[in-house]
Amino acid sequence: MSNKLFVLVFLAFLVGCGGGGGGGTDSAAPQPAPDPQPAPPPAITQLSFLTSNNAELDADISMTIDENSIMGRVESNASVDSLVATYQFEGTNISIDGVAQQNGISASDFTDLVNISVENADGDSRAYQVDLTKYTGLPVVYLTTENNAAVESKEDYINGTVAIDGGRYFDDLPESIIEIRGRGNSTWVLHPKKPYQIKFENKTEFLGMIEDKRWLFLAEYSDKTMLRNRTVFEMGHLSNLEYTTQGVYAEVFLNGLYNGTYNITQKVEESNNRVAIGDEGYLLEIDQDWRLDPDDVFFYTDEFDGPGLVNIKEPPGISYGTPEYDYIRDYINDFEDALFGEYFTSDAWGYKSYIDVPSWVDWFVINEITKNVDARSFASIFFSVIPGEKIKKGPIWDFDLSFGNTDYADSQYREGWWVKYNPWYERLFQDPEF
């Protein structure tokens, strides 16, 4: 009897605990839903341009992603103004400059820097900048000769064309008719990478440089940094010299073959946009006999490196024995007589009555700082004369062997003077006022 009573009491206890009252818990009641998980951070993990979507490409391009920058290169002849990108990304959608993109379908212009944004389901976004560089990023110049003829002479032009893909920073130039020949002296004879000169029929703007007919392609073979000429040109632009050449680096193809990186520059010549001396002015260069062209007209002076050869670069067509020739020969020799004469410091009778002193100072400072080996007495020492005016020094030119880039002269050393021992400057330094 006691056992039955115990069982009944135990069952009653269980019923009381189970629940009909307000204080119990129903074990079958639904559990609350967990908090939603945040979407993965938006990110582009791969960006490619596939030949299957871009017929103009010769090979697939897989871009490099570095934080928020996406970079890559494409061949120089590829068109990038309508490319289809393929993405691998974390997120729900991608846009370019606010325009939604269909992965592997939408075409966009990648000529300039492009801003891409990827967004996830939570509305978070991440921005990237895409830099698809054509070739090296420099403008590309295409030179083509008639019948793909080789450029073998620096005296005789051959017919051809030039075209420019200016890339991101320069204007394109459609195929244009030119003439082309070699240029230079030792740079033409000794080096496998040849320098060139091209000539348009009409004045033409070239790589952002003010229009003119003739343009030089400096190979810079002796200067493996390719920095010396351009660095010194910048020094010239900072000086008070009236004119200093401009230049632009470019990749050059000749008859479809890559020729290398060139420094494309203005030519040192008479022009309203270059050496502005007019039709009656003279552009002169200290030079060497063996460097002369057959049609060059020149004269000697008595004192410059005994004697000094002065090549008359302008005006064109000047002839020996003409009044124009006699004038400039006599004027430069009269200057030398005044410079080396007894009263050379006299304002009225000395060198100051012949030369524009500030230009002579600036020319010297630039050439001495850079230890330009040619500038002491060898070549590329330019100066100009307009009848009735004083002799102006410049433009500066030819610095591929400056800044110690020689092993045969003391100009290779940082210490000491070099250009100061130019005969004219050596005498000028004897005047404390100079």
Can you name each region flagged by the protein language model?
Residues V15-G16:
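C-terminal motif of bacterial Sec signal peptides marking the signal peptidase cleavage site
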Residues G24-L138:
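Beta-rich interaction/scaffold domains
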